[in-house]
Amino acid sequence: EKRKNMNYSECIENARTRIGNYCKACPECNGRACKNQMPGPGAKGVGDTAIRNYDKWKEIRVQMDTIAENKPVDTSLELFGKKFKYPFFAGPVGAVGLHYGDCLDDVAYNDILVSSCAKYGIAAFTGDGVDSNVMVAATKAIKKTDGIGIPTVKPWNLDVIAGKMEMVHESKALAVAMDIDAAGLPFLKNMEPPAGSKTVEELRQIAKMAGTPFIVKGVMTVKGALKAKEAGASAIVVSNHG
């Protein structure tokens, strides 16, 4: 079935009937309407972290300079030997049904996201979760695009991570990430053996397991960036998990 093109307002209006109870499909995704809800995109505790993140992003502007050759602007980016059309990727979401309603399951969501990003010249980060099928679906979707996608593995214990990395290898993913800013999630801390925070040495072991460029997502300080570099990370993502 051929779908009509939608403008942003129509997209938001349509989303409100499909996206579940946590995300409110706001015109401006600023963390205010969804704060202090778990699960969901808003922040826990006093609920201002996602809000402060968004407010800080608004301070960043592209500097205009029109004194240049009159030709199309090159927005491309080269990363890990691959060239992308634009310098932004789709962020990772795991357990889609839990967070964003039952309109799409993880298999359908990842198939749409990963293939569409690859088709239009960027790449998708994919998520992870307590349901092992989340990573299975993500890596299968990435394999279909010849590795144009980046699985994001949660900071489980090392045995669980090793199993996840096998799926990453099978997918031929261009890189793999770990969202170390998920270290405080209760379902990780309550595992046996405990999961969560990782030392430099543990991250070094994980980077070796990866066998592909390893991205540490969840670095907020210079000290953290230097630790990630010491552990053998190929890149970092500045993030605090919202």
Residue ranges and their predicted role:
Residues T49-M135:
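N-terminal functional module of multi-domain proteins
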Residues F88-G91, I122-T126, G147-V153, V176, ...:
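Hydrophobic faces of well-ordered beta-strands that scaffold small-molecule active sites
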Residues R3-F84:
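An N-cap/entry alpha-helix motif that binds or orients negatively charged groups
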Residues A123, V134-D159:
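Long, hydrophobic, well-ordered secondary-structure blocks that form the structural core
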Residues G91-D106, I150-D159, T212-M220:
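Active-site mouth loops of central-metabolism enzymes
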Residues G42, D102, T126-G129, V153-K154, ...:
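Glycine- and other small-residue-rich loops at beta-strand/loop junctions that grip anionic moieties
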Residues S115, K144, W156-G242:
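Alpha/beta enzyme core
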Residues G45, D105-A108, P193-K198:
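Alpha-helix N-cap and loop-to-helix initiation/capping positions
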